[in-house]
Amino acid sequence: MAEPNDVAAAGAAAIAASFEAYQEERARITRRARERFEKRDWAAGQADARERLDLRDRLVNACVGTVRAELGGAAHDHGLWRAMKELYEARVESRPDREIGQSFFNSVTRRVFVTVGVDPAIEFLAADGPAVREGPVPVYARYRREVSTEALLRTVLRACAFAAPYEDLERDARIAAIELDSHLRELDDGQPIEALELVKAVFYRGKGAYLVGRLRRGRYTTPLVLALVHGERGVVLDAILFTQEDVSIVFSFTRSYFHVEVERPRELVAFLSTLLPLKRVSELYIALGFNKHGKTELYREIARHIAETGEAFVPARGDKGLVMSVFTLPGLDVVFKVIKDEFKPPKQTTRREVMDKYRHVFRHDRAGRLVDAQEFEHLAFPADRFSPEVLRELSEECRGSIEIGRAEISVKHLYAERRVTPLNLFIREADEWTARQAVLDFGRALKDLAATNTFPGDLLLKNFGVTRHGRVIFYDYDELTRVTDCVFRDLPTPSGDDEETSGEPWFYVGQDDVFPEELLPFLGLAGRLREVFLQAHGDLLTARYWRAIQERIREGEIVDIYPYREEQRLVHGYE
């Protein structure tokens, strides 16, 4: 019979080996992004993204099976797992991705024990250890500005050394330098560029490649992103972004995750935090594709906020939904969504179908228009931190998802998302110009979603939101479907007065039929805002528009929605 220490060592070794396999496979998939960009193999890039998203759960599940086999009847021995945690920590302590390894261990323990809340004896509560320091080789390269901004940009573009030619590198460096120098003159702080510190790894996503760094200008730093695309005639510097707002949109929670080679994620996150100080650490890990560890960091941020404030969960702003109970913490820009036990008419979906829709969004190109939702299970919160309104709604409508104790309320399943302002409230409260811009972007959002094969299903304004950057996004997924699964039809012409005045449809309507001409009343737009929408986006109300989108998707066209405005494209602006 094996000694307990031997069993613990075997269990820790099994988890460490699984984590090592995960990181190696993840890195292998990520490395392919460069070749996909160079060869313009966008379909393969999409397949890589899906493969990487599924990878961690697959290996964690396999690891759980291995560990159960190693531990046998002691699989739920708490003392044994405490020893395993110590042994595992020793194995990953010196790794540059130590925090990712700790989250991997936590995932395994939670699958085995189905832990409610957090068990500090067998889980890592935080990536404790020394403060983030630059490794022996920093994650960025430093380029001094010795001659001109144009020469500096020319140098960094050449340093990429893609196995594909630039369409016109000299032109791109010249135009980008004009844009950047003009912006810096407007700052009027008298600080010229001294150097550019650029992350060595290229950030790939969809059809884009991004060089990310910061300009050193005396006591100031300026974020900088060079956005590259690969067209039919070669690689092009498509945009240069140099404000916190524009760079933040590149790393938005409405975007799919980057494929970027990173050996020291904690150090890279620390660097990115200097560019984007308003972004939480959790969001940066998630943007880099370490979404499971990002979820761990998000939980820690939530727990820290609860511990440090006297805030209670309160109902989120907006109309109450039929599918979810939604609440928030006033000082934290996160909403929590719990699926209700029953859905009142006219909803005809099921809990499983709702969860499948969220899973679909997780694996889909979010096009900058779909909120990333982090899925949690078995969380516990202090009972005295729930307002009476939230507690009443959870007790009455989500009883199957919660357990109420004297000290804690445990939630079996919830989604956490970034909090945004519901579009219907935003328009109601905004001035006329701002409301017009929101309506225009609402139409653009519908078109971006359509181009990436997403039809919201329910187009009521309350199901859309506005980010702090003024972008319209969609966050209510229970009726979401693929554009290619819909049948877009023109309304038949009535053949007589009886049909024209009938209060019921006098023609057959299939389950997947959509009549775009009938969508306008559901949008809830009136007066001048209705006119603004119709003038700019009236084509959305025609079946012809949607059928054309379906044809493009079925022909294999892959549309990439870039994280910057059309007018920010460099060649577009100077042709």
Swiss-Prot record:
GO terms for molecular function: [isocitrate dehydrogenase (NADP+)] kinase activity; AMP binding; ATP binding; phosphoprotein phosphatase activity; protein serine/threonine kinase activity. Bifunctional enzyme which can phosphorylate or dephosphorylate isocitrate dehydrogenase (IDH) on a specific serine residue. This is a regulatory mechanism which enables bacteria to bypass the Krebs cycle via the glyoxylate shunt in response to the source of carbon. When bacteria are grown on glucose, IDH is fully active and unphosphorylated, but when grown on acetate or ethanol, the activity of IDH declines drastically concomitant with its phosphorylation. This is Isocitrate dehydrogenase kinase/phosphatase. The active site is at 372. ATP binds at residues 316-322, 337. It comes from Anaeromyxobacter sp. (strain Fw109-5). It holds the Pfam family AceK_regulatory. PANTHER family: ISOCITRATE DEHYDROGENASE KINASE_PHOSPHATASE, PTHR39559. Signal peptide: none annotated. One of its GO terms (cellular component) is cytoplasm. The gene is aceK. It catalyses: L-seryl-[isocitrate dehydrogenase] + ATP = O-phospho-L-seryl-[isocitrate dehydrogenase] + ADP + H(+).
